[in-house]
Amino acid sequence: MDFFAGVFGWTVIADPGGSFTGWVGDRLAAQVVAGHGGWRVVFGGDGARELSGGSGVDTGRVLHGPWAPVPRVGEPCWVELMVAEPDDGYWAAELGWETRVESEDFALFLSARHGGPRPVAGRLRTSRSSGWVPYFAVDSVEQTCVRVSELDGRVLVEPLVVPTGLVASVVGPHGGECVVLERPAGWGGTWSAG
């Protein structure tokens, strides 16, 4: 948690049971649960229900996403599912999303929960490890990469421009790969425009 607090400027609060939360002002940016490695993404739903594979949907206020305020520096601002073999139909069916294929390797998941469809998440075909990867808002991708190195993290993918905006992939000294996105205008960077 100290690494990401140093990179994103989070205020860290210790919770009972060895967990920690990272805050940007009055908004929760992340929670580190003792004994759980990597990032876990939570999607809000209309009502609690059981999903396949033991997953669940819970109600609650959306902290981050297309209907939340514009992401501040250090807050989650996008999420992508990195997979070798996409199964877009699963996510669309389980979460009530639409799928918009942008290219052979990339698709957008959209939700019309609160009006017209908005991008909620992306899916990228990759040969790297599979899973949900969070993006965090930063003022400068270049300066963030320098800070990552100063704190003994690694830059896995150097800064580059992708349809979402200017990004880089980074990882802390103890894991937790994520992507940093420079000054997103909304959830999903350029995808927030629609």
Question: How would you describe each model-predicted region?
Answer:
Residues 1, 46-48, 86, 141:
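Residues at or immediately preceding the N-termini of alpha-helices
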Residues 1-29, 81-116:
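Core segments of cupin and vicinal oxygen chelate
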Residues 9-12, 87-90, 121, 138-145, ...:
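Ligand-binding pocket scaffold of soluble enzyme catalytic domains
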Residues 17-19, 36-37, 105-107, 129-130, ...:
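Short acidic/glycine-enriched loop/turn segments that link adjacent beta-strands
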Residues 21-52:
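Extended, compositionally biased flexible segments
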Residues 36-40, 74-78, 129-133:
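Short, solvent-exposed beta-strand edge segments and adjacent coil->beta transition regions
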Residues 42-46, 82, 135-139:
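Short hydrophobic/aromatic beta-strand micro-patches
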Residues 45-81, 102-116, 122-125, 146, ...:
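Vicinal oxygen chelate
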